[in-house]
């Protein structure tokens, strides 16, 4: 793509991001749909931060569909950067749900999902379990090591964690062990 083409696309993306902030539901939904066609990964972080503030169910649904439709593996970095940010802690469940609903493989982030499950509440652990169950691999040995450390820390520092969360963490530990055993077979 020419420099002018990239510049034109960036201007279009910036305009669509401005339209999202308009407060007009029709305009916001049209802008989200425009980002599906004209957007690039630079729009993901501001869009995720906007989603955190959304109270309109139509806009929320449109954003859920937008993130579930992602196919570009390069989008993973921006989404994980927002997901791991403590400022979105109360919003992580939606981001995690969008991750397991999309077609992008997040296998490179196995350890981060295990850590989020260990450090978060029951619903975060449930969403992380679903993400982990849907990972395709392959995995680096370091992912297993970091996952085991997160699981060990969870067991050592577990306070009054619910029985349900403890069960989820047990399931995650079994999956990680199975993934590691299958990894060792190659």
Sequence positions of predicted segments:
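Structural detector for internal amphipathic alpha-helices that build alpha-solenoid repeat scaffolds
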Residues: 2-7, 28-38, 49, 58-72, ...
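Alpha-helical oligomerization segments
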Residues: 141-147, 153-186
